[in-house]
């Protein structure tokens, strides 16, 4: 007996030249709105984030097949009711045997194209932000991009990969009909209804400039879409920037804490990672915590403190619905890691010979 979801998906995919369009139907998964009761106990700045990987989806024969299969994986991921879902770099074309000219597959950045439209409809249906990494074109240039789609299916922001590989930049070397233009160094962090987020792509992680820019722009979550997994360098930058990192790659997916420690990862049979994170959270060197006993004595289980010995980092987060961490920092004169580093740099500059 054929799977009903496969039949529905086939009908869904046949409507355009790409094989995608129409409506997302036949899914057996709950939408976020259907399961909203499960979110009522969330703290004010708690957010569920999820990332999928491409393992077992490549190589693939056609873009239509790839998009079909990634949508099924996304439907699995939305069972955890994410506020934000991240897809891998160039998920619709990466390791797909069907070769098409770049001008044909690149999407418009202002008006949703064939692929972006499908992902936008998915985002709207499931009431979640989605990072949609695709080729884009703008003013005669091609970019390796990540498009942030909001809960209503609108394009909320576009990021251009700052550091393409040399083969990406050379016309006809990697893609038919053109090479990639490197993105600008100064790109924004994007506002969402839960906080500021930023995006990086693959080879970008080998340079500090993108990470430094997002730190200055106040990104609390960095979405790393990639072909290669990134490895421990992602953990380093999560700790260095005191931000959460969610990685969605060709081989794995991970959620990384602001301390630099892994919180979740995709597994052999579950090809997405998810975690409910608290954005009302700071990191500070463990040796600065002399006032912590007083903090615990006053607020008890309304705060959560965890020491990460390997990095000598301690994280503090609010667990109370009306208790703001910014107020606790002022009350107990807690120096966050970022404040400690910036004030130390000021002292160094002032006293250096």
Report residues per predicted region.
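N-terminal export signals
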Residues: 2-5, 11-32
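C-terminal segment of N-terminal export signals and the immediately downstream linker at the start
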Residues: 29-68, 287-291
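Active-site-proximal beta-strand elements of phosphoester/diester hydrolases
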Residues: 46-59, 195-204, 223
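Solvent-exposed loop/turn segments at secondary-structure junctions
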Residues: 55-57, 91-93, 136-139, 165, ...
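Cys-nucleophile CN-hydrolase/nitrilase-fold catalytic domain and related Cys-dependent amidase chemistry
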Residues: 63-152, 228-229, 240
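CN hydrolase (nitrilase-like) catalytic-core segments centered on the catalytic cysteine
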Residues: 111-129, 196, 205-305
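Active-site catalytic loop in hydrolytic enzyme cores
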Residues: 138-217, 232, 236, 240, ...
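A short C-terminal boundary segment appended to hydrolase-like catalytic domains
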Residues: 281-353
């Amino acid at each position: 007996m054929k799977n009903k979801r496969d039949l529905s998906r086939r009908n869904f995919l046949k409507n355009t030249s790409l094989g995608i369009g129409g409506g997302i139907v036949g899914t057996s998964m709950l939408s976020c709105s259907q399961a909203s009761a499960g979110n009522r106990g969330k703290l004010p700045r708690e957010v569920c984030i999820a990332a999928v990987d491409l393992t077992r989806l490549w190589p693939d024969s056609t873009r239509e097949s790839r998009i079909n299969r990634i949508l099924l994986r996304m439907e699995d991921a939305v069972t955890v009711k994410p506020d934000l879902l991240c897809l891998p770099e160039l998920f619709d074309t990466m390791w797909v045997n069907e070769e098409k000219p770049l001008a044909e597959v690149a999407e418009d950045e202002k008006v949703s194209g064939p692929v972006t439209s499908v992902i936008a409809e998915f985002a709207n249906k499931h009431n979640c932000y989605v990072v949609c990494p695709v080729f884009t074109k703008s003013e005669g240039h091609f970019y390796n991009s990540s498009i942030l789609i909001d809960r209503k299916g609108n394009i909320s922001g576009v990021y251009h990969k700052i550091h393409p590989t040399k083969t990406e930049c050379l016309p006809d070397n990697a893609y038919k009909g053109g090479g990639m233009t490197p993105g600008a160094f100064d790109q924004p962090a994007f506002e969402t209804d839960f906080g500021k987020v930023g995006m990086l792509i693959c080879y970008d992680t080998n340079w500090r400039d993108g990470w430094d820019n997002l730190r200055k722009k106040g990104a609390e979550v960095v979405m790393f879409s990639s072909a290669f997994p990134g490895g421990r360098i992602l953990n380093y930058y999560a700790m260095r920037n005191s931000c959460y990192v969610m990685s969605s790659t060709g081989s794995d997916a991970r959620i990384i804490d602001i301390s630099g420690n892994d919180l979740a990862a995709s597994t052999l049979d579950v090809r997405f990672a998810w975690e409910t994170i608290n954005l009302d959270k700071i990191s500070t060197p463990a040796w600065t915590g002399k006032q912590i006993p007083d903090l615990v004595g006053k607020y008890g289980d309304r705060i959560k403190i965890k020491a990460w010995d390997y990095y000598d980092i301690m994280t503090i987060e609010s667990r109370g619905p009306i208790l703001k961490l910014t107020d606790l920092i002022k009350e107990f004169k807690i120096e966050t890691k970022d404040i400690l580093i910036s004030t130390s740099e000021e002292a160094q500059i002032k006293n250096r010979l």
